[in-house]
Swiss-Prot record:
Homodimer. Its cofactor is Zn(2+). It catalyses: tRNA(Met) + L-methionine + ATP = L-methionyl-tRNA(Met) + AMP + diphosphate. A motif ('KMSKS' region) lies at residues 334-338. NCBIfam families: metG, PRK00133.1. GO terms for cellular component: aminoacyl-tRNA synthetase multienzyme complex; cytosol. InterPro entries: aa-tRNA-synth_I_CS, Anticodon_Met, Met-tRNA_ligase_1, Met-tRNA_synth, Methionyl/Leucyl_tRNA_Synth, MetRS_core, MetRS_Zn, NA-bd_OB-fold. This is Methionine--tRNA ligase. Belongs to the class-I aminoacyl-tRNA synthetase family. MetG type 1 subfamily. Zn(2+) binds at residues 142, 145, 155, 158.
Length: 793
């Protein structure tokens, strides 16, 4: 039996984790708990990522040393994860001697094997802080709009993309001193040289390990576009020293050493537990590494980290299964750790809403194949209808009925052995449904398809609820007691099974509900920050092997209400309380009074007198910054160096031919694209793809057929001339073409991808919209043929 090594993305220590960050840690927790219930040998490792520029800068802002800052936020993260009932085997840190030892060892192996190169580059240097500055830590006056607070990578006032040297009167963001241009030499990992060995490993592993589709496609895209040598050193003080002559004053770049943290944190665990860390990481053929990562970090774990391990020449345990999620967005916007926007772990902890209620919604809404939205309205509806109305209702009504009408004693009957066909048929139907669910949930869980697995458990709960309702035990206990007893006995065992199935997701609730029936379930200890937690407590516990068993239940305690429904008043108060940024909330003197109704908060809901920072809604962002227009595709050809890229030439109404590259080869043939009048992202920053510059992006939406095969449909406006602006309903007088052009002309010349995707275009009943407003082309709405709901991009 394969051993399971489980890791989640190491959270960075510059803020509180928000719900989007928590998805990875929680997902790995659910998978590890499932593995323990299956009695696989399991090790779940995580910890805080502590080195790098962001830590140094944050420490300066907070007037702390980097060590003090990391210790402060490490304790906060550990406390939040503890509150969320996350059962790490060990939660460590990357600023340890073990991390230094292993990182330097891997580097030395890479260097010895000829995979390290040197390159000299020019960077801005602050003579006052005595350090080189990353682009975003240079401020100055924008050469385009004269905004004085423009960053060295982009002016957020007008959207213009910049280099630090473009700024007028540039200054260091930390001390205000004028920077100098200096040369510096860095070490690089020669990824192109490692690619041949990587390409022997990746396809087979991705197939055997069933990598999530986004992980597979992103990895192939990186290879298709060509890997470049990547710098692995930085001119910083806070980091792991480089063990190479001439580079003693440099440290390793955080992206290089951070994934090695999985190994070093395992060593920290092993050192305390008296174990051998190499038994999990070196020369082991019976270990499967499951990694849980957000999509922005996928290539570092599917390409860069494996290349580093392969290049070392040693037989490291490498990625087996990659569970990469899409984004969880917040109320039609984006969670932002740096800006403090959204619901954060400390918010959840202080809200009064139980941890398992948060866990329920995160997994019911887990963004496995597409981005999903956290909205307070949906949170309310899912909690009230599924968690409380379905699962809790089943548990409470069954336990209450047994306690009230059978004196708390579960009928000791087996309906499958009844002499009556109607009773045997009822029991057979329930057991067949349960057996099918067990099989499906096990298969899904084995491959970390957690949302579908979770939904399946709730579907089984619905089956049990229907059996209760259809069986009418409140009538039959007097008119047909034999049937009522068989039904209630079967429901008690079915509830026992469902509680085992959901225990990885909601361990606290499942423990408490199982206690109503005199049972215990164990899937992991909560890490206390002091010692490794790998021992199962003494006593008898239910596990996966007990699914389907129909013996052992005797009595039922009088159940208590564990969760309260969330009413509109409560939800409106939460939405108000968690709008804006964390900084705005701290300025508020009063909190959320309606939260008291759910036992969620002791504060009042009055609005803050402090003026909040202006935050653009997706619709406002689109109207102010995002430029879409029509273009006619006049030629299509395959990219000579990329299997999945088309090179499209377009007439965009400007008088000059425009080139856009798209990854549509797997989805559309050339003749399905040629001649179409499509929608393009007009002011998206140009990007080189395999040596050819792509000026913009074609907009399309995807849909899946019954076999889960992905298809793509282009957004089109065949009635419009090339160059026709796309505007949002209500933005300009659509009857006046000049007014539309004038409105369109106010948008910035270039925006980055993050800005573009911060205004999601959702397909609602075949029509592209932003926040419910239609996108119009020459006064007409667009309508897709096959994509009824989804997102365009």
């Amino acid at each position: 039996m394969k051993r399971k090594l489980v890791t989640s993305a190491l959270p960075y220590v510059n803020n509180f984790p928000h719900l989007g960050n928590l998805i990875q840690v929680l997902s790995a927790d659910v998978f590890a708990r499932f593995c323990r219930l299956k009695e696989y040998e399991t090790l779940y490792i995580c910890g805080t990522d502590e080195y790098g520029t962001a830590t140094e800068t944050k420490a300066l802002e907070e007037k702390k040393s980097p060590e003090e800052l990391c210790s402060f936020y490490h304790a906060i993260h550990a406390e939040i994860y503890n509150w969320f009932n996350i059962a790490f085997d060990y939660f460590g840190r990357t600023s340890t001697p073990q991390q230094t030892e292993i990182t330097q060892g891997i580097f030395n192996d890479l260097d010895k094997n000829g995979y390290i190169t040197e390159h000299t580059i020019e960077q801005l240097y602050c003579p006052s802080c005595k350090r080189f500055l990353a682009d975003r830590y240079v401020l100055g006056t924008c050469p385009s709009c004269s905004y004085d607070g423009a960053r060295g990578d982009q002016c957020e006032h007008c959207g213009k993309l910049l280099d630090p040297t473009d700024l007028k009167e540039p200054r260091c963001s930390s001390c205000g001193a004028a920077p100098e241009v200096r040369s510096t030499t860095h070490l690089y990992i020669n990824l192109p040289k490692i690619v041949p060995e990587y390409e022997k490993w990746m396809p087979k592993t991705a197939e055997e390990g069933r990598w999530s589709n986004n992980a597979l496609q992103m990895s192939k895209s990186w290879l298709r576009d060509g890997l470049q040598e990547r710098a692995i050193t930085r001119d910083l003080k806070w980091g792991i020293p480089v063990p190479k002559k001439g580079f003693e004053d440099k440290v390793f770049y955080v992206w290089f050493d951070a994934p090695i943290g999985y190994i070093s944190i395992t060593k920290c665990w092993a050192d305390l537990a008296g174990k051998d860390w190499k038994a999990w990481w070196l020369d082991q053929n019976d270990v499967e590494l499951f990694q849980f990562i957000g999509k922005d970090n996928i290539p570092f774990h599917t390409v860069i980290f494996p290349c580093s391990l392969i290049g070392s020449g040693k037989n490291w345990t490498k990625l087996f299964h990659m569970s990469g999620t899409e984004y969880l967005n917040y109320e039609n916007g984006k969670f932002s750790k740096s800006k403090g926007v959204g619901v954060f772990g400390n918010d959840a902890k202080e809200s009064g809403i139980p941890a398992d209620m948060w866990r329920f919604y995160i997994f019911y809404n887990r963004p496995e194949k597409n981005d999903t939205q956290f909205t307070w309205k949906d949170f309310q509806e899912r909690v009230n209808s599924e968690l409380i109305g379905n699962l809790c209702n089943l548990v409470n009504r069954t336990a209450t009925f047994i306690h009230r009408y059978y004196d708390g004693k579960i009928p000791q009957v087996d309906g499958a052995k009844s002499g009556r066909e109607d009773i045997k048929s009822m029991v057979k139907s329930l057991r067949e449904a349960a057996s099918a669910s067990f099989k499906k949930i096990t298969e899904l869980s084995d491959w970390a398809e957690l949302r579908d697995s979770f939904h399946e458990a709730f579907a089984l709960s619905s089956v049990a609820n229907k059996a209760f309702q259809d069986g009418e035990p409140w009538k039959r206990r007097e008119t047909d007691p034999e049937y009522a007893e068989a039904l209630m006995s079967e429901l008690c065992y079915l509830i026992k099974d469902i509680l085992i199935l959901i225990h990885p997701y909601m361990p606290q609730y499942a423990d408490q509900a199982a206690g109503f029936f005199g049972q215990k379930i164990w899937s992991g200890n909560i890490f206390d920050g002091k010692a490794p937690q790998f021992n199962k407590p003494e006593g008898s516990f239910l596990s996966w092997k007990n699914l389907g068993e129909r013996e052992g239940l005797k009595t039922v305690e009088n159940p208590v209400i564990i969760f309260k429904t969330l009413d509109n008043k409560v939800i409106d108060a939460y939405r108000e309380r968690y709008s804006g940024s964390q900084k705005d909330r701290k300025k508020s003197e009063k909190g959320c009074s309606a939260c008291k109704d759910s036992g969620s908060s002791k504060s009042d809901a009055a609005a803050s007198s402090a003026k909040p920072e202006v935050k653009l809604s997706p619709a406002e962002l689109f109207s102010k910054k995002i430029a879409l227009k029509t273009a006619k595709i006049i030629s299509v050809e395959r990219h000579p160096d990329a299997d999945k890229l088309y090179i499209e030439k377009l007439d965009d109404g400007s008088g000059e031919e425009r080139t856009i590259l798209s990854g549509l080869v797997p989805f559309l043939k050339e003749d399905e694209i040629l001649g179409k009048t499509v929608i393009i992202a007009d002011n998206l920053k140009p990007r080189k793809m395999r040596g050819i510059e792509s000026k913009g992006m074609l907009l399309a939406a995807s849909w899946y057929d019954e076999e889960e095969k992905e298809h793509v449909e282009l957004l089109q406006a065949p009635w419009a001339a090339p160059g026709t602006p796309v505007i949002l309903e209500g933005d300009a007088d659509i009857s006046d073409p000049e007014a539309v052009k004038a409105f369109y002309a106010q948008k910035p010349a270039a925006i980055d991808a993050d800005t573009f995707f911060a205004a999601p275009i959702l397909i609602e009943d075949y029509i592209p919209k932003i926040e419910g407003k239609k996108l119009l082309v020459a006064g007409k709405e667009m309508k897709l043929e096959k994509v009824k709901t989804g997102e365009a991009g």
